[in-house]
Every structure is written in C-alpha cells, then in structure tokens.
Amino acid sequence: MIRRIQPIQGIAVIEFTLASSVLFVLLFSIISIGYLMFSLQAINDVTRKAARLAAVCQISQSQQIASSVAASSVIAGIDADSIEIEYLDQDGAVLASPTAQNVRFVRARVVSLTYQLLSLLDFLGESGLIDIPSFETTIPSESLGIVPNGTNTNC
C-alpha cells in the first residue's frame, strides 16, 4: 500500500505570524528608544533656553522664566518646579542673594524627571520607568535685564 504524502497547508501563515510578531516588537522598541533620545534632546534644549533667558532677563524673574520655558517645552513631564535657575559668581559658586554686579554665570538645570518606556520594554528600569539624569547649561551672564540708560527690561 502506497501512502500519499499530502503537503502541509497553512505553514506559511504560521511562519509569517511568528516572523512578523518579532519584527513588530523590534520596530516598536526602536521607536520607543528613538522617542527617548528625542526627549533627552528636548530636555537639553529646555536647559539651554532657560539659561539664555536667565542671562538676559532680570534676576527677580527666574520663576517666570522657568514657567514660560516649561510651558513651551514639547515634553509633557517638565514643569516649573523641575527647572532650577542659579546665579554664579566668578568662581562658579552659587550666590545666595545675587545682584547684577556680582553675577558672572547663569546655570539652568532640569532635575527630578522620569521617563516611562513603552510597555514592551518594561524589563528596563523599574517597570519601564527610567530616571532621567540631570541636564544643565552654564553660560556667562549678559545684561540681566539692565539696559544702558538705567531702565529695566521686562522679559
């Protein structure tokens, strides 16, 4: 008796399902890591904007600067409390009561931020929650809101 071997049907669908599921997981992981890199660059941009504004605006407006920079950020987790603006002397020490005469540098930093990864990457960090390192920008002070004729500017 001769048995006929029948071709297995449906194996291509199973192979496609297995291969496509692995490729989709890989694709979404790459997208998630890409968005993390974009977020880190946007946080760096926030520190740069805050430092620039603090260098040209009045010292008393540092909280308003932090609020406006946080509001214009493309990252949702940044608020005014996570942006610190500090005024430094010529040695780089933080001034307790800065004035336009003793400020030589301005430092802006973003602190206490976390990033939630895509649920596929929950094995990273604590359930996908990653602590973002502190970003800071230090630049020389400029006008600090004082114009040559002695009047103050309003940033």
Where are each of the predicted segments found?
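Short, conserved structural patches
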Residues: K49, L53-C155
